[in-house]
Structure formats: C-alpha cells, structure tokens
Amino acid sequence: MAKTAVFDVLIVYSDRTAISANTDRVDVFEPFPQGTNNADYNVVYGYFLTTCWKNNLSAALTTSADISGAGRCRSYWLFKNNHWIKVKKTGYSRLIFDKLSPVSRKYRVSRELLFSSKQVKQFNHEDLFQTFFDKQKTYNQLSQFSAPTVTIEKSTAASIRKACFELKAMINNHPCSNDFSSEIVMKDRFGAGGRDVYKFKAGESVKMTTIMKKSKKSFILQPLVKFDKVDIRLVYLAGKIVQTYIRVAKEGDFRCNEHQGGLLKYIAKAEVPAAVIRQAKRLIKILNKTTTLFSLDFMVSNNGNIYLIEGNTGPGLDWNLEIKENELAAQKLIRLVVKELARLAYIKVVI
C-alpha cells in the first residue's frame, strides 16, 4: 500500500475551478485551466505554496474530485522549482485552507466528507462561513447593516410578484428609503464574484422568470442603492484589518467586482471613511468571530448611509498580473495568511 503524504496544510478547490492531479490528460500541466478567468491562479497559488515551503510549512493543492475522506485526498498538486507537479498518491492534512463552496449537493457532500472528523479543521470559522455563504442568512443576522433582502421561493411569475411585493413593503418601512432607486437587483443567493447579478426596472417580472428558469439557481431581491458605483472592502485576519481597497465599476455597469470589469485600487486604512470603520466595528461585535480570514464589502449611498454588500470568508488572494502594486499587495496578504497557517499548524514562522 502506498504511503500517505502528510501535509501541514491542504488547499482545496472545487473541480469546476481546478483540474484534479489525477487526470489522465497529458496536456494538463497546471491545476487551473488556461483560457479561463481562473488561469492566473496558477501564479497566485504557486506563490502561496512557495511561501509555505520557504517557511517549513508543507503544503499541497487538491480538488473536490479528489476528496476521499476526512482531510484526505487521492491526488494533489505540488509547486516546486517554478513548476506544477501532479502527484497521484494519497495526501492528508488536519488543516484545510478551504476554497470549496457547497453550491450544489455534490459539493456539499464532498465538503461534509472533508470535514467529517473533528481532527480536521478549516482555516476559516464554519459559522462565519455559513453566515456569509447564504445572502439571505447574512441579511437575517445583520439586517441593521444591510439593504432589504427577500428570497424568491420558486422560479415562477407568482413567486417573483410575491417577493417584489414583500420587498416594496420593506423599502417603504425602511428609515432610509430615499437611498433606494426604483430598480431592483436580483442576485444568486449563494453566488460570488458578481456572477449571476442582474438589474431590473419595475414590471420586468417576465425577464426575471426567464433568467431564473434558465439558471436553476436560488435568487434574492434587493433594492438598487443609489451610490457612486464604488465599493469598499476591508480584509480582516486574526481580528485586525490587514488590507483595504476600493473597487470601481466599469462604465455602464453597477457591479464593482474585478471579475465583471471593475477596477481595484488599494488604499490606506486612513483613507477609508471613518463612518465605514465605525460601522464595521459595530458589525464585528455582533459576529464575534474574528480569529479568521474574512472580508466585508460596503457601499456608501448618495445620502451618506452605509450598507453592507456582503461578507466573504474566502476573499480573493489573486491579483491583476499587469498591475505591480496589486501584485505586491496580494503577495503581502498571502504572506500574512501563511504566517497564520503556520501558527495554527504550530510551525515556527520565518517570514
């Protein structure tokens, strides 16, 4: 029987994002497919694994397709001498850097298997993950910080009309109802990266129904906040703000995400509006789960009111390869994450 390789940390991605090291394809030399939006992750996670190994932290990357037990995988990727290496052997770690979102039953089952032992722990806090993964749950727990949010129960015209009616009532009762335009936003309830986010005018329920039936996903409705198409992200690690940046939507769009053409610009913490920092502090007191990596995204309405857009326990570690400033900032965050991973794995840090 082949010996199991034991790692200090195992990075786990879904097999829809990364390719299993167990693939028989001879033309696959990297985990993240070229020609996709995720191709740059090959550079990002190459740097991540290199930083781990430089600090005597053994690390590998695997996919949901490889999960074979608690903390266990049937194959994995290594990064050595600036090259990715496929290893078709069993790997194990009790510390997981989790990038696997349970967006379907398949991934829920894989994730449950991965963490089926109490001996295996994830880098991020499970309760916080569950709160931020579900946008309706985010609103239910943090409604005082968020724009009104309603889930569309079914992909039918009747359900959409009902949700729109409920949302309208919530807007009318909101103390800052003037912050909201007449347009509404429909979002994938469990989505990320600005994907499956749509804007509609009143009376466009037929279009909404068509999109829902085609996508077969669960959606929420929110009012479109009147703002300057800029959002602010605060990145926290071990209870402290370690990174701050703004994202500016591209011309003609309202989504600020980089994946949707938004421009990311790093700023100093001192440049973040003081009111946003105060709001974030109030929110964090309620969360009471700060010993982890997570981010909070805020927008400021044209009237000066602050809204939480979403939280994320897996903020992107990637960067625009064409912008050196972004590369250096992202690499700094990776080094901080590795430092915290080393602490959790009881390894002496040399960063």
Predicted features, each with a name:
Residues 180-183, 190-271:
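Phosphate-binding site of ATP-dependent enzymes
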